[in-house]
UniProtKB/Swiss-Prot annotation:
Compositionally biased tracts (Acidic residues): 248-257
Region called Disordered, residue ranges: 240-265
Subunit structure: Component of the mitochondrial ribosome small subunit.
Organism: Arabidopsis thaliana
Keywords assigned by UniProt, alphabetized: Developmental protein, Karyogamy, Mitochondrion, Ribonucleoprotein, Ribosomal protein, Transit peptide
Transit peptide: 1-28
Compartments, as annotated in UniProt: Mitochondrion
Protein name stated in the entry: Small ribosomal subunit protein mS77 (rPPR2)
A GO BP entry: karyogamy
Null mutant phenotype: Failure of fusion of the polar nuclei during megagametogenesis.
GO cellular component entries: mitochondrion; ribonucleoprotein complex; ribosome
Gene: NFD5
Entry function: Required for karyogamy during female gametophyte development, when the two polar nuclei fuse to form the diploid central cell nucleus.
């Protein structure tokens, strides 16, 4: 971990934290409490950061939201409902981001403390502030998927080892959060009426103990997988509908901007001409050779000439003759029985093939003589 180094510019920024205003996003106020657990540090940080620049947003707590109503301006019920839904979405997003950053800081604090055992708590907090600032920038830029992937162009302020550790910790935190989400979702399906009904039936037929517990979680997991599958289908349908609506709007705009003319030129849409011959290769086999065309024609002709009819049923005297053929000895001549069999059955090609196959299974000597 000794290679886990900050550059000279980053160390300089840490030394200027007390006099220089850092740029944080709206979610960073929840992380300052995680980095420093004392109210004294928060008060000193607030005193040191006057927020004189209007463009820098001041950290806003979710408990300090006020709605101002006057006689002249009142929100309608519909707009209030929309605002409430937007606030709920923002709160959910803020909660997810805060949970991610809290877990990230907890793990990263241990790694930084291990890499710099001689640094005091204030210096460690300064390093964590710089690291979390970069992570928040990535979240604001591309979401959590951006954080979980490797950075396209690492910052010059951090070393390559530090960046690798940051993305490793981020992936670990995202995986843990996904496991927690699935675990909480699993609890809902374990207590669902369908799963409870199946467990009740299993208990009635004598299933108890660990087996019943395993079956209960198995049924809940299957139900959760089905629900996620149908949710993905719903999302795909909504996406397709939005694409169709956008295409319809674009088509209407084009029709509105279209100016009809007396002479309309007809245009033929065709694929561009390809130069040279097409080459088809399947598993390294060159199929563009003309011999494969001839072979395909022969196979097609053979399929047309093939007789796909079923053989005639062998009954009565014909069946007795067939039994005599199967009971022939090695020195017996089957020609007389074959002539009688052919006279009774009037066989086709399929019947002869069926006879040969039956003799091959029942009498090998007669099969060889008939085949010859």
């Amino acid at each position: 971990m000794k290679s886990f180094l900050l550059s000279r510019q980053a160390i300089h920024r840490i030394s200027l934290l007390s006099s220089k205003t850092p740029t944080f996003c709206r979610n960073f106020s929840a992380i300052t409490s995680t980095i420093s657990h004392s109210d004294r540090h928060l008060r000193s940080y607030d005193e040191q950061t006057p927020f004189q620049n209007v463009e820098i947003p001041r950290p806003i707590s979710s408990f300090n939201r006020y709605f101002h109503f006057t006689r002249e301006s009142r929100l309608s019920e519909s707009s209030a409902a929309i605002d409430d839904s937007n606030d709920q979405e923002e709160d959910d997003e803020d909660g997810t981001t805060n949970e991610f950053l809290s877990r990230f800081v907890w793990i990263m604090r241990g790694k930084v403390s291990e890499a710099y055992p001689d640094c005091d708590k204030k210096m460690i907090d300064g390093m964590l502030l710089l690291i979390v600032e970069k992570v928040v920038e990535e979240i604001e830029r591309g979401g959590f998927n951006k954080v979980g992937s490797a950075p396209p162009s690492p910052s010059s302020e951090f070393s390559d080892d530090l960046w690798a550790t940051i993305w490793e910790v981020s992936n670990t935190v995202l995986k843990d959060m996904e496991k927690e989400r699935k675990k909480e979702k699993m609890k809902q399906y374990v207590q669902s009426p369908e799963v409870m009904e199946m467990c009740r039936f299993a208990g009635e037929i004598g299933i108890r103990g660990d087996l019943l517990r395993e079956l209960r979680f198995k049924w809940a997991r299957e139900k959760m997988d089905d629900a996620e599958f149908y949710e993905s289908l719903e999302q795909q349908r909504d996406l397709d509908n939005s694409i169709r609506e956008s295409e319809t709007v674009d088509g209407e705009v084009e029709e509105e901007g279209f100016v009809p003319s007396d002479e309309v030129e007809s245009r033929s849409i065709s694929l561009p001409k390809r130069k040279g011959k097409l080459k088809y290769k399947i598993y390294g086999l060159e199929l563009s050779d003309p011999k494969w065309v001839e072979m395909a024609d022969k196979i097609h002709e053979a399929e047309e000439e093939a007789d796909w009819r079923e053989p005639k049923p062998v009954t009565g005297k014909c069946k007795l003759v067939m039994e005599k053929l199967e009971s022939l000895q090695e020195g017996d001549d089957p020609s007389g029985l074959l002539a009688e069999w052919a006279e009774l059955l009037e066989p086709n090609r399929v019947d002869w093939i069926a006879l040969i196959n039956q003799l091959r299974e029942g009498n090998t000597h007669a099969y060889l003589k008939v085949r010859l």
